[in-house]
Amino acid sequence: VPASPPSRATLAAAVGLVALLTVVALECLRTLLSVGYFVGERIGWITGGLVVVALFAAPVLAPVLRRLVGSTAALPVAVAVLVVGRLALQATRPVPFWLAMAAAGLSFAAVTLGIAALRSAWDDGSVTAMVAVGAGVALDLVVRTTGATWDVAWRQDPAAWLLSIGLLAGLVAATVLVHRGDIAPADEDHGGPLVAFLLWPYLYLLVVTTQSPAFLDAAAGVPLAAGTALAAVNAVVGLLVLVAMSRIGLPRAGRALGGLAVSACAFVLPLATGAGAVVLALAAQVAASALLGAASGAERGERHTGIVRTGLASAGGAVLFAAGVLVYVLHTIQPLPVTNRVVPAVLGLLLALSVIARPVPDRRREVITTTPLVAWVAAGVAVIGFVSAAALAATAPGTPSATLTPAADGSRALRVMSFNIDQGVTEGQLDLEQIAEQIEEADPDVVVVEEVARGWSLSGMTDEAEWLGRRLGMATVWSPAADAQFGNVVLSRLPISDARVVDLGKTAGTQARSFAVATLDVGDGQPVTVLGGHLQNGDDPAIHDERAASYRTILDAWGGRPRTILLGDLNTYPREVPPGWPELNLPLDAGLRTTQDVDRCTAPTSNQNCPDWIFTSADLPVAPVEIVVDRPDHRPIAATVTIPPSG
């Protein structure tokens, strides 16, 4: 006999509970990845990666917690401890690895318990649980727009604390309502374990690509506001398609085509740009939502599945999620034998094969309770998503109008800076505000920032280029490296009259690097050209050859023009540093000059880590290079360049 649905109030509370649990889980996940990045650098990428992947098996704790505290108390206890852990994440600096792991693991178990509660309530619970998770991903998108994609868990401003407290208070309130309502905390839930497993590959696609504003704006080459609007569109479409396919089902041929579409889109999407990236993201969202909807609908009315099987299935999917995220990014550090794009493609294929194997329902599914629910959820997602996008558009910095004030002799002082921020992660802490303050301390007119992430998982899937541009009120020129989501940005408080990107290609390294060329208007009627970027690191002969080839390409782009500055993390050491760095002669022989020691790592870059350089054309006098702030890895360098009177 089908289970009767709970009251509307309890249903709304349960959906809100799972949605808010999803938001908190995603925040804890991103925090863990940033902290784990630092730990991986210390204990080894393979070891650190295995530790993080193992943690994602935490959903198996759901049945353990039920056994320890009882079915009725398990979810409230998990939520209470999670609230404390989430507040501790934001209050503790630096965030210790154990705390990040504990909060993330508990959040995964709590999500599993919340989904099990929804699935235990009535026959349509499996579909409703997927709608609730989808709503949570969309709500997470909106929450992150308040910090231009920088997570509130890392922020210390009053608005971030108020938002965190509000979200957690809502989570507690929803838990109380569900606990008092007519959703019985059964030890079994309706449907098989398949959807609990498939949820995680589906989440991978949403969180990393189709509903990631940073991924979408970087790939499409549009502002963050537009990327947020695109993510909101994908969220609404995904919810509608999921519920529609849960009602009407998909024949095996349709599932096969959908699976092929998901896998193909997932393989191509990481390198897609422009309008093609937008179309592929929407296609991947539609195909994946159709497959998950068909699987959820097929589970309606199935025999009950114990919480143990649900926990194990969820743990298996979560481990695949973690493996996919880490293997994809770590390919740039320790290359795989094949392209890392096979990772999302394999996850998409796994999603497809699992659904194709399901029996086709004998009749159309009547999902009476879920249909009005998803209408309200989709409408809410659309409204808050587009309002958030409009708010981002309204607060975007305008075109810079600053000029350099001439001295008595007509010359102008141009302050330049190079800063490798290592994805914004300093000793495990994603503190973008600290980086912005360090840039402000140097007071540059133009700064080249290397190792900038725009949607990469290890930096919390933040759009760091957009965030820095907004925070500092500077214009940006983006140049990709590993993909459209990782590279370098030129920030300028002066007007940029022209900008282009020079492709450096890919040879011995894992990244297809590029160099930005920005033409600045300094106010004297004559342009100043800035070339900035990041070259491949390493001292193998093949890497030396690659850097030399990159220098030649950059120098060709320069073409000997006057009033030119070349700077960045060039990963080139002084010539006498073993094993010898002859490629440094290329810019020097071409006529560029520097005040840095070209033979040894001497002051100011004297910590035996001096790969960062500032060169100028012969007509631009430059003051000695300075270290702006002492950091554990790359120390930002700055110098004042004198622009002689024009004419």
Predicted regions and their residues:
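Short active-site-proximal "capping" loops at secondary-structure junctions
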Residues: 452-455, 601-602
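Active-site regions of metal-assisted phosphoester/phosphodiester hydrolases
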Residues: 2-442, 470, 475-477, 483-647
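Proline-aspartate-enriched helix->loop->beta-strand connector
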Residues: 439-452
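Cys-nucleophile CN-hydrolase/nitrilase-fold catalytic domain and related Cys-dependent amidase chemistry
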Residues: 454-475
